[in-house]
Amino acid sequence: MYLLGITTFLVVWQIISLFYTNLTLPGPIITVETLFNLIGDMTFWTQFLNTFLKSLTGLVISLGVGVPLGFFAGLNKKFDDFIRPAVMFFQGAPIVSYIAISMLWFGIGFYTPVFVAFVVIFPTIVFNISNGIRSTDKNLIEMAKLYKIPQSLIRKYIYFPSIIPFVVSTLKIISGTLWRAVVVGEFLAGAYGIGYSLSLSKATLNTEEVFAYTIFLIAAGIIFEKSLLKINLNPKIKIKKNIEVTHNEKTDNLKDIELDNVTFSYNDTNVIQNLNMKIEKNKTTALIGESGSGKTTILYLLSKIRKGFTGNIKNVPEKVSFVYQDDRLIPWLNVNDNIKIVNPNLEDRDIEKYLSMMGIEEKQFIYPEKLSGGMKKRVNIARALAYNPKLLLLDEPFSSLDLKTKYNLIEDLKKIFSNDNITSLIVSHDPYEISEISDRIYLLSSKEKNIIWEQDLENEEKENLANIIKDRIINGG
């Protein structure tokens, strides 16, 4: 159909040209002959390279100015509000206005088309990049702040790589506009280039050359745009070994964590109300209950992701890890670096040990896009443990694992919890998981917005625990 469309266009053009002279409308055959004569002359290619150089210069300047402005506008709303009126001013004026201004400033020559290209595509770059920064996955930022990754590294390894797809999409958007802006600038105020050659042909009434140049410009523009559309850049970044992150933790001063009369509201509705709970140090505590009972909210309060509660939360250690329900892996870092970024002091062999514990040591240098959901969950757990936390929060940590991996992982975590000084709090709906891994359990109710049953599990017979927990869940405490 594509070839049929082109053929039909050429036939119609040829038929119409029969009713006019070549001075008014040359036919496609003579136009193609003229085009081949032009491209056989080195002067033509010199003109073309000059136009291409102007386009490239305008693009580089636009990216050099627009990307940093868009980056900081995306990070800082006040800065965005400050520059937005000026950028919109650039965006609103027609091209001929900038040609007139640039002719006053630069005269006729190389810089006028470059300036026109800059002012035409610069606003699009700024707005697209700022929108890209604002749409950066907030879960990744939340994860980075939990692990106390410095702001400089968040910018370097999360924010900045996240704008690369937006830079690529912006190039695809502006490609045709850039090419046309340069040619128009050359046509009206150039001293060299394809647009300038087109203006000379027009001035001398050489209609065959006008049409030949037009066909070439259309073809070159299409090729330029199609080439950019094929760009599909997925950033891949390696973490340097010399980054430093320090955490000061007084390990000899860890105490039981206490929640005293804690109330937290969301959209003017209490999620938990006057909650009192103790999480014993170096023990594993479990939270169960129906959806909406506040289990995950408690994890978020302890991790300081959620704020604005009333009451008191005491003795939360500085180093807190969180095994999220979603994986929250940084897409452009491999598995090794997704772990290293939370604890840069680890060597690759140390990271391999954590991955081996999860049964995925062979995935150490694979990127997240190549991992299954279960593998991502295991990397999530390995990262949390590699942080060497004093409080480990786990939100449905085994939900996407197969049974064999799940049982093996539970046994591994039991060993870790018994040998290391880790206080852990787990949210789960599975009585088996809770009975195997927990020392104490709290059952929460969405109706009461509080704890309705609690049980010390250490002194219970293991074979009875799962049934006891299941019965309590079904009967609501």
Predicted features along the sequence, with ranges:
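Transmembrane alpha-helices
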Residues: 115, 119, 152-184, 217
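Conserved ABC ATPase "signature" region
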Residues: 145, 348-363
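Helix-to-loop junction immediately C-terminal to a conserved catalytic motif
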Residues: 303
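Conserved signature/switch motifs of ABC ATPase nucleotide-binding domains
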Residues: 369, 387
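Hydrophobic anchor residue at the start of the ABC signature
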Residues: 381
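Catalytic Walker B motif of ABC-type/P-loop ATPase nucleotide-binding domains
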Residues: 392-396
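Helical segment within the ABC ATPase nucleotide-binding domain
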Residues: 407-420
